[in-house]
A protein has these predicted regions:
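Feature captures the catalytic ectodomains and active-site-proximal regions of enzymes
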Residues: 1-376
């Protein structure tokens, strides 16, 4: 049975996109190469051999069978939802709205009426910073912390001992309903945290995403899909036969091993620690360590591939930890294909929908959106 595996290394951009300045990226982001430089280099022989590092501008020669290059996102966004959607053939032509000055008061008031309590925050902020600023007030009052970022997100942070997880998720479902037209906010995110005023507050791994419903895409055509990590949530679960909602790279590793034992034709996984723990927190050394750890995971995955498998490694956007910003960056993304018949430097390809086109071609599915990288 032919099988396709796509692993997204979240935030591992491969160099400044031509339209980066239109997305407020003026400091020439280049996530992978800047992580390499800032960390003094790192050992990742499997990522080097397949061409993933070379695609990211790192001076490591691929082996002769490597088929690799870069993809240029054409959708109007630089976030995980837009990136994953584009991989599966969705071209987001109009950007989702952002709220740098906070959400409209009518939206906040409607949300407060529905959940039966006031909220605090309503501003653009770093998620780790705002819980330090408002965590004590939240604990004292029980009022949820509502905030946004540079992305189109409505985030709700609550202490796990004050607002139980399921209640927080219910808040998010209410917000998801309210955040459709005319607001059309792309994603509602539950941000549970723990801690106290004395020791500080820390986000937990029980985050949950509630995205805007995905337009029709390749997953609807395949349907026999095993999703690992945040991926199923980005598509509102539609088309996934099996899912494993893991929360960290070590958990994703275990889930991916389980997925490879299944009979799913398409395995779609996201490893988010690069972005979540190191990109947003401007930690290039931690980013490098995570790449070294993932390289070991890649070695295991390669050893379990069959002759009928292809494995595609890519990213959904950039998140350069060496920049002053703590937000995503508009970059090319690397792509490396393992299991293809021949090696080649593919250069730059327009459209991340090339991922879906390649998966569809390998699985024998009639799909006309994107460039098949097996034939490029």
């Amino acid at each position: 049975m032919k099988r396709a595996i796509v692993i997204v290394l979240d935030g591992c951009g491969a160099g400044e996109a031509p339209d980066a300045e239109a997305f407020n990226d003026y400091d020439h982001p280049s996530t992978l190469s800047h992580v390499w430089e800032a960390s003094g280099g790192f050992e990742a022989p499997n990522l080097a051999a397949c061409g993933y590092l070379a695609a990211g501008g790192i001076p490591r020669d691929p082996d002769s069978k490597a088929r690799y290059g870069r993809l240029r996102e054409i959708s109007m966004g630089k976030d995980s939802v837009t990136g994953h959607w584009e991989m599966m053939g969705v071209h987001t032509e109009h950007p989702f709205p952002t709220y740098p000055d906070g959400f409209p008061i009518p939206l906040i008031k409607a949300f407060e009426r529905e959940i039966g309590t006031q909220t605090i925050g309503n501003r653009a902020a770093s998620g780790t910073a705002i819980i330090q600023d408002l965590g004590s007030l939240h604990v004292d009052t029980g009022f949820p912390i509502v905030y946004t970022s540079a992305d189109s997100v409505f985030q709700i942070a609550c202490h796990e001992s004050i607002v139980p997880l399921e209640k927080l998720y219910d808040y998010c479902r209410i917000a998801r309903r309210l955040c459709r037209a005319p607001n059309n906010i792309q994603r509602v995110i539950a941000r549970p945290f723990i801690g106290d005023t004395k020791s500080g507050f820390t986000r937990t791994e029980r985050r949950k995403d509630f995205p805007y419903p995905a337009p029709p895409n390749l997953i609807d055509q395949i349907r026999d899909v095993y999703g690992v990590g945040v991926v199923p949530e980005l598509f509102d679960g539609r088309g996934f036969r099996q899912t494993k909602r893991t929360q960290s790279n070590p958990e994703h590793e275990v889930a991916l091993e389980e997925a490879m034992k299944s009979d799913a034709r398409f395995i779609f996984a996201n490893f988010e620690d690069f972005d979540m723990l190191y990109g947003h927190r401007n930690d290039p050394k931690g980013f490098a360590m995570a790449l070294t750890r993932f390289d070991q995971t890649l070695g295991v995955v390669k050893s379990r591939m069959t002759p009928e498998d292809i494995l595609i490694l890519t990213a959904d956007h950039g998140n350069d930890p060496t920049s002053e910003s703590t937000d995503h960056s508009r970059e090319y993304v690397p792509v490396a294909i393992l299991g293809s018949a021949s090696g080649r430097n593919l250069g730059d390809t327009d459209g991340m929908m090339a991922i879906g086109a390649t998966v569809a071609a390998h699985l024998g599915i009639d799909w006309s959106t994107g460039t098949n990288l097996l034939e490029s």
